[in-house]
């Protein structure tokens, strides 16, 4: 992967990119304090290129029973064999809204290649609010709610208490990219990694 940022750190093969300049404060987070605006960007180096170099999705995220808008539950681990993008968001978050059209395009482009987006609301907004918002934004991917365990795990990884936050999981159930914050650079990294991971087969 090209080095899009100046600070590059090898972290078990996992790419972690912090874009705090365009993150919203997450009122649901258990971690207090403002979102960092000077957090360093972190990417993997070329030393870790194989699928096996990536760490598995934390159990708290993989095995959490996620409630969707119809009241049904599902788990991220049930989607093993697919490339999954997990996005933490809320309707009031500007950077979250800004990246959604890109997510819609990604879902449409790669749906037939086993790619799924799961958008998890972090603010316990009502089903009616979320459905109305999804219709307005023409969201074409699965929506649900992020529980405390999922939020805590994202914060542990990114050390960022704001949203949006995004994780890309490969077909083996391993994290290949985690991004804290939004913005053009974050979206470009997401698009690049989705294309690469989907086409790995």
Predicted segments, located by residue:
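Thiol-/selenol-based redox modules, centered on thioredoxin-like
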Residues: 41, 165-201
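A short beta-strand-turn-helix
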Residues: 56-58, 63-84
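Short pre-active-site segment immediately N-terminal to redox-active cysteine/selenocysteine motifs
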Residues: 82-84, 88-92, 162
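Rossmann-like NAD(H)/NADP(H) cofactor-binding core
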Residues: 86, 118, 144
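Short, internal strand/loop/helix patches
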Residues: 133-171
